[in-house]
Amino acid sequence: MQASMLDSQWRLTIFSPRRKVKVSQMNSRFIAVLLTATILPWVAQAQDSYPSSPVTIMVPAAAGGPSDTVARLVAQSMSKTLGQQVLVENMGGAGGSLGAANVAKADPDGYRLLLYHIGVATFAALYPNLAYKPIEDFSSVGLITEVPMTIVGRKDLEPKTFADLVAIVKKNATTVTFGTAGTGAVSDLCGRLLQDALGTKITLVPYKGMGPAMTDLIGGRIDLACDQTTNTTTQIKANEVHAYAVTTKARIDVLPDVPTVDEGGLKDFELSAWHALWAPKDTPAPIREKLSEALKTALKDPMVIERFASLGTVPVAQDMATPAALDQKFKAEVERLAKVISEAGK
């Protein structure tokens, strides 16, 4: 009987609800410790060996455009530093937001990156129903370059100076056609900023990329366009279009005879198509730092510098090709451009 009581007492102790909780807590702690001991070294090893396979840079625009050109130059140089191929993939649509969504949903392992321009900073304002949030859902790697924009016109357009163009556009705004690469594209931003500076509305004509827009401009079917010098310099030098102004504070070396917008009488008008590199959110800091270092090396590569110069741009300073610098720039541009888009009424 005594043994039976002891046995009963033992069972009550072991299988009482309180004891179950204690055993469960002990098991949970043990599992947590075990997982930490096994997973953390694996994660650290994965980060140390990164990259162990090819890296893909997503350009959310058609091949052959300015962003694609920048991406392929940078990818070629980064491949040497990382010891793995850096591939470029193109996915256009919705002003770049579709390709960006592809990266936002990717695994945060550093193998799928986004390279695009200032347009990323417009997505939240232009597409309020996006399935992702640009600031929250991307991890910054670094800035790459700030490409000047050039306002160009069909070569038979009557005014030949930017000041004369401004005067004529103000008088005939509704009849002036301005080609863009679509809502949210940097060319579209240029058109919106021009409207704001002129204090009038012009007819913005959206195309599926700047290629078709430039074709129509050269063919005389639209009056004006605004695109990155990486895309317009060849046409300007071939006398296929007329260059009116660059959208930076100073003239640029590759087009020294083209005045600035400010020189033409529009004050406080400045726009550059800065390009940058992002990874999906939660990408580990060591991986982003490794990517940033490879990016910095690419921006010092003589081949990249020479090719950028021929396109009318230069790499950013080394301290700008960092996650922190891009974070600051990106947040400021999102705020600035949201106001521009709101005032333009989309």
Swiss-Prot record:
InterPro entries: BUG, Bug_dom1. Residues 1-46 form the signal peptide. The keyword Glycosyltransferase does not apply. It is found in: Periplasm. SUPFAM superfamilies: Periplasmic binding protein-like II. The keyword Transmembrane helix does not apply. One of its GO terms (cellular component) is periplasmic space. This is UPF0065 protein in the TAR-I ttuE-ttuC' intergenic region. It comes from Agrobacterium vitis.
